[in-house]
Regions:
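Conserved alpha-helical scaffold segments that buttress catalytic/binding sites
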Residues: 2-341
């Protein structure tokens, strides 16, 4: 049965590699605590009572990717990313006290693994994910979600919208692909944003770094006809005299609130993912964007990464890459070291 596993301190401790003279982030993060709540239930007040500002959770699944005829493997990113994050040094730059590690979704394989069966299962995943996101946002916290496929953008956007009083979300997606495929195909990782738009939860949608080689003939016309959808093509970035961060800041200048940030790891060169690319952003480009951010994003979703793919490819550094993105996102809105008492 599909469910959400809430982590205890014991779950966290099992992932920490202790070393004399060092303190790890995992020794300072918070876990969910509600002794009076029924087992497995997440209470909004209990989330509000936590001193942590950020709530970390995982969606280790690749059903949405497979439903889009992609290569399985994105379910492997969460554990690797979490272990990498928990073993970062706790210090004055980031202590770990800022983070509540909530847990991860446990999603069973569908009995019917046909394309239709997989797409039906994605609908089930949507219904499982959005209420948890809704509670986190309702509690005034910022969810950091590690996927999983980009199909999960739809329930994350829905949950964030409902949790913020029903306000439509405005989202910028760093991605080589638009994920605006036809909803009539059935749910999969290629139509997360068209689903969010069609469901009324998404207002502005901006794609940064979209690759011209991976869009169908009708997409440019579709974008041009919709004033709320904007794309900055990666090929235009390559020809621009401005830096990536300058183009980014100009591109998101009119992004309204509440807003969400999506990072598809297939936009970054040589990161193992469902659609790994040889041409894309450098990891430090994305780190620069995150560390220079001063916008209060309502959520961060990092998706499509993997440590092991069904075709046999492996990369043990993916978890560390994701951990960098998580910590950069948090550090950006912390007081600079020079401003701390």
């Amino acid at each position: 049965m599909d469910s959400f596993k809430i982590y205890t301190q014991s779950d966290i401790d099992l992932l920490i590699s202790e070393r004399v003279g060092e303190e790890k982030l995992g020794q300072h993060v918070h876990v969910y605590d509600c002794p009076t709540c029924p087992e497995g239930e997440i209470d909004i007040q209990a989330l509000m009572d936590s001193p942590a500002r950020y709530v970390l959770l995982g969606i280790p699944e690749d059903i949405g990717v497979r439903a889009n005829l992609g290569i399985a493997g994105t379910k492997t990113a969460w554990n690797s990313a979490l272990k990498a994050l928990l073993n970062i040094q706790s210090n004055l730059f980031l202590s770990g006290e800022e983070i509540l590690v909530l847990g991860h979704f446990e999603i069973e394989e569908p009995i019917d693994t046909s394309l239709q069966g997989l797409r039906k299962k994605v609908n089930t995943i949507d219904a499982l994910v959005y209420p948890i996101i809704q509670k986190i946002v309702n509690a005034g916290k910022i969810p950091i979600v590690i996927g999983g496929g980009h199909n999960n953008a739809a329930p994350i956007i829905a949950g964030a919208s409902l949790g913020s009083g029903g306000h439509k979300m405005n989202v910028v997606n760093i991605d080589a692909h638009a994920d605006l495929r036809d909803r009539a195909e059935g749910r999969h990782s290629g139509n997360g944003f068209s689903t969010a738009l069609g469901s009324g939860y998404l207002n502005q949608y901006k794609i940064f770094g979209l690759h011209q080689n991976y869009i169908n003939q009708s997409l440019p016309d579709y974008i041009a006809a919709n004033q709320n959808i904007k794309a900055f093509y990666f090929e235009d970035l390559l020809q621009s005299p401005k830096s990536v961060i300058e183009n980014w800041n100009e591109f998101i200048a009119d992004l309204q609130e509440p807003s969400g940030l999506e990072i598809d790891l297939d936009s970054i060169e040589k990161v193992l993912s469902s659609a790994q690319t040889s041409s894309g952003f450098q990891l430090n480009d994305i780190r620069n964007i995150l560390l220079c951010n001063r916008r209060n994003f309502a959520y961060l979703h990092v998706c499509e990464g993997a440590t092991e793919m069904a075709d046999g490819k492996t990369d043990s550094t993916t978890g560390k890459t994701i951990a960098y993105l998580i910590t950069d996102f948090i550090k950006a809105l912390q007081p600079h070291i020079s401003q701390k008492p």
